[in-house]
Amino acid sequence: MKHLKRITAIVLALVIMAGAFILPTSAAAQERGASDGEKVVRMYFGHRPRYAYLSGHTWLYFENLTNHDVQVGLYTVKPGKGVSVGSYGYDIEDGRGVYYNVEAHRYNSAKVNDYVYLSTEITEKQLERVSEKILLSGTWFYMLNCSYFAITTWDVVSKPFLMYMVIPTFVHLQVIMNPNHGTGFKMYYPSRSEVFKQVGRGDNARLEPANPDSTGRMI
């Protein structure tokens, strides 16, 4: 029991330290992201708790608001449609990394909407910065998990600022404590052929077909 308390204290200390480093960078990014241009995408920050809030999954969803194609990372989104983007560790057959449309396919297939969210509308320039962040992502381990990917990508341009919390319970609390949060937003239902894994980073990144099915292991 003493060891568990000590481990918990260490994790909380690391979370606070990470937040202290991320905050100045994210605040500056928000200032750079301020723009009165046309909003081209509605970006959602989604969190679905699991196992009595002890675990969960966090991801982003991008809805095209225009009458033309928009680019989210490596994925082209048609007018009126959207794409989910999330980082996975173990609950995926094709290995750790960033995936497109896994959440949208899984949650539509299972007909579940027990997730909470925040949303914001962003301009084309802001979307370009978000896409750059996605293309540079791909690493997954316990301290840099799905929450880390979603929060640090959201914070590139969006308000409210979200502090990275490795513990799913704290991610959930950050969302529901915001008076503008919602529950169960609708996502475009992609076919299995529209699910991809991002392989490589930056200019070397590419898409490969991926299996959206869950392995049953914790995310």
Language-model features: locations:
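Bacterial N-terminal signal peptides that target proteins for export
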Residues: 1-11
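Hydrophobic core
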Residues: 12-21
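Sec-dependent signal peptide cleavage junction
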Residues: 20-32
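Post-signal peptide N-terminal regions of Sec-secreted extracellular proteins
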Residues: 30-35, 112, 120-132, 215-218
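Glycine-rich catalytic cores of cysteine/serine-nucleophile enzymes that process amide/ester linkages
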Residues: 32-112
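Second-shell loop/turn segments in exported
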Residues: 48-49, 113-119, 132-141
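Solvent-exposed, acidic/flexible segments
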Residues: 52-55, 120-127, 139-147
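Activation targets extended, charge/polar-rich intrinsically disordered C-terminal tails
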Residues: 129-219
